[in-house]
């Protein structure tokens, strides 16, 4: 097994969350095809800071670990949870935040409903389908994964697909998606619609488990400062600027769109 930087990070997080050696190896077998992709690896370092100064890739790996632990515990201990598909829950975790561009300290202005917090689930599922099409061959599995990713922010709302411009950072990829996937994404956002938004939890237990894991990781481990919490509202994080200044870079991260 190659000891690349993503795997080394994964082992550190598995130890932090007290995953057994057996489960550490088992979970890695599930996520390895996703975690070793070049696009995932890119999101494990600067400039992809997700919450505070924690990288996006680090956040996703931690979400996958906590999702695995929650799903495994529920499946083992609850009689009515025996049908939980642990693999699907973990895959949702690995895909849920695969958005296109860093979102903190960028200079691009968008209308409120098209800001990062509302549209990033659509960007994430678009990238997941584009980069990992093998996970979406089965219509049933595709719907479970899509719905879980789209509604992982619950109880927060997301942008509904309603034929108005979403200002997606990966619009070209979205436009190239096969129509069947666009239809599934739209269906997922139409249910629970409130104006330009959609507000509901995932229909599927795997998505609900992942959504819970996401809150545990974000609120208990990712964000460790006032500036980090403030960035969730303002999109500007002074901690990133301080980190860059400490490393000799006096410029904030800028969004370099091609």
Regions found by a protein language model. Name each.
Residues 1-258:
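Metal-dependent phosphohydrolase cores
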């Amino acid at each position: 097994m190659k000891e690349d930087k993503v795997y080394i990070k994964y082992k550190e997080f598995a130890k932090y969350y007290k995953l057994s050696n057996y489960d550490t190896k088992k979970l890695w077998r599930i996520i390895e095809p996703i975690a070793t992709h070049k696009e995932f690896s890119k999101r494990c370092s600067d400039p992809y800071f997700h919450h505070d100064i924690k990288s996006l890739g680090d956040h996703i790996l931690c979400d996958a670990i906590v999702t695995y632990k929650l799903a495994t515990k529920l499946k083992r201990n609850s009689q009515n949870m025996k049908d939980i598909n642990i693999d699907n829950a973990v895959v949702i975790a690995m895909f849920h935040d695969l958005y296109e561009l860093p979102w903190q300290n960028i200079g691009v202005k968008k209308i409120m409903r098209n800001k990062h917090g509302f549209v990033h689930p659509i960007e994430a599922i678009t990238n997941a389908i584009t980069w990992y099409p093998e996970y979406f061959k089965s219509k049933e599995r595709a719907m479970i994964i899509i719905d879980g990713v789209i509604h992982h922010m619950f109880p927060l709302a997301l942008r509904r697909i309603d034929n108005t411009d979403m200002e997606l950072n990966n619009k070209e990829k979205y436009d190239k998606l096969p129509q069947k996937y666009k239809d599934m994404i739209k269906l997922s956002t139409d249910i629970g619609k409130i104006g330009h938004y959609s507000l509901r939890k995932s229909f599927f237990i795997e998505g609900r488990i992942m959504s819970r894991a996401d809150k545990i990781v974000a609120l208990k481990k990712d964000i460790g400062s006032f500036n980090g919490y403030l960035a969730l509202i303002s999109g500007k994080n002074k901690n990133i600027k301080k980190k860059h200044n400490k490393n000799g870079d006096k410029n904030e991260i800028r969004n370099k769109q091609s």
